[in-house]
Design a protein with these regions (language model features):
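Alpha-helical transmembrane segments in inner-membrane proteins
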Residues: 40-353
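Compositionally biased, low-complexity peptide segments typical
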Residues: 27-31
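Short, Lys/Arg-enriched N-terminal segments with co-localized hydrophobic residues
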Residues: 32-40
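Positively charged N-terminal leader segments that act as targeting/secretion signals
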Residues: 4-15, 26, 37
Length: 353
């Protein structure tokens, strides 16, 4: 079957035409003028088509455009390099984006992100401490979960004590991230373990290797977290109207906060154990969907997981192609994209005053 890839480039271009046919049902005009027509595809179906198309292109297109040397070599490349990188990108993108959507509702702040408020840093700290103590890699997702959970609970308590506010949340997240990063750096500096020293690339947000965790272990941690966040979606909508209103409607605010924090910590911890810290992704995807698609928080969490998976896979593939032969960590690229987006979200409310 891989003899197809030995054909010239113009013949391989048929793949792109086939993938483009997936979108034939959907008219893209409503993206620019939604009053004139409508999209025949539901958001979940459209995102699934995007996911399948991106995965097909990622699998079937090489770094370069030369002919493949042998089908067996192509088979090994797909199985040993591209497939692991694809499912790592999908899991990490889904985990960070869904947890970001939930945290934004919990803190009632569109700037909330697993990396910005220190959750990702706490997860990374949990992983490094486990490895430094001689723990096995099978417990990495669990250690990442407890690290993220501890930071989330601390932020929730202090944020409530200070009375909320965007600036207070960001300052608190910055302090916790800096503290976690300092402890991680100290452990890595004092360690002679080769595994710990290899964490430098992992911490930069690289998908070149599946981190210190296996995808199966990460899924086992991430799936319960995703279900927990989905079950909290409708009550998060009520919480965003105000704590007093939510309490009067029978919502246990305290239990909802703990549930959301646990779900977000599970997903963030599993994602960080695979890829290290990737900032801004959990902030960008939910905000883009909230401004374009809208809907309930439950729907936003689900769509954020879908779109986050697609987006991270596409960005990683584009970064590899543009910087070849250097394998640029995708976390660096996401940070370059997310920085201006963060400034836009931060300045926008100030300009409207």
């Amino acid at each position: 079957m891989f003899a197809f890839f030995r054909r010239p480039l113009f013949k391989r271009a048929r793949l792109f035409l086939l993938c483009a046919g997936l979108f034939s049902k959907c008219r893209l005009k409503p993206l620019f003028n939604p009053l004139e027509t409508h999209c025949a595809m539901k958001p979940h179906t459209l995102t699934l088509c995007l996911l399948l198309t991106a995965a097909a292109v990622y699998l079937c297109c090489g770094i370069g455009f030369g002919a493949w040397e042998s089908p067996l070599a192509m088979d090994e490349t797909v199985r040993q390099i591209r497939l692991p990188r694809i499912y790592t990108a999908l899991l990490v993108g889904a985990g960070l984006s869904a947890s970001g959507a939930a945290l934004q509702a919990l803190f009632e702040n569109p700037l909330a992100d697993p990396s910005l408020i220190g959750t990702s840093g706490g997860a990374a700290l949990g992983v490094i401490v486990l490895l430094a103590l001689g723990g096995g890699t099978i417990g990495v997702p669990t250690a990442a979960f407890f690290g993220a959970l501890g930071v989330c609970l601390l932020i929730l308590a202090v944020h409530k004590l200070l009375g909320g506010g965007t600036l207070g949340l960001l300052v608190l997240g910055f302090v916790l991230s800096a503290f976690s990063g300092a402890v991680v750096s100290m452990i890595l500096f004092l360690s002679d373990d080769l595994v710990l020293r290899s964490a430098t690339t992992w911490l930069s947000g690289s998908l070149a290797e599946a981190g210190f965790s296996s995808p199966v272990a990460a899924i086992a941690v991430m799936l319960p977290g995703f279900l927990i966040l989905l079950s909290a979606g409708r009550r998060l909508d009520v919480l965003m109207t105000g704590e007093d209103t939510a309490s009067s409607m029978g919502v246990s605010v305290g239990a909802l906060r703990v549930q959301t924090v646990i779900g977000a910590a599970l997903m963030t911890g599993a994602a960080v154990s695979l890829s290290g810290i990737i900032g801004f992704l959990g902030m960008m995807i939910p905000n883009v969907l909230a401004q374009t698609v809208g809907g309930s928080r439950r729907k936003l969490i689900a769509l954020s997981a879908w779109l986050g998976a697609v987006f991270l896979m596409v960005v990683d593939g584009a970064a590899r192609w543009l910087t070849y032969p250097v394998d640029l960590p995708v976390g660096i690229v996401i940070a370059l994209l997310g920085g201006p987006f963060f400034m836009y979200l931060f300045i926008k409310p100030l300009k409207s005053r």
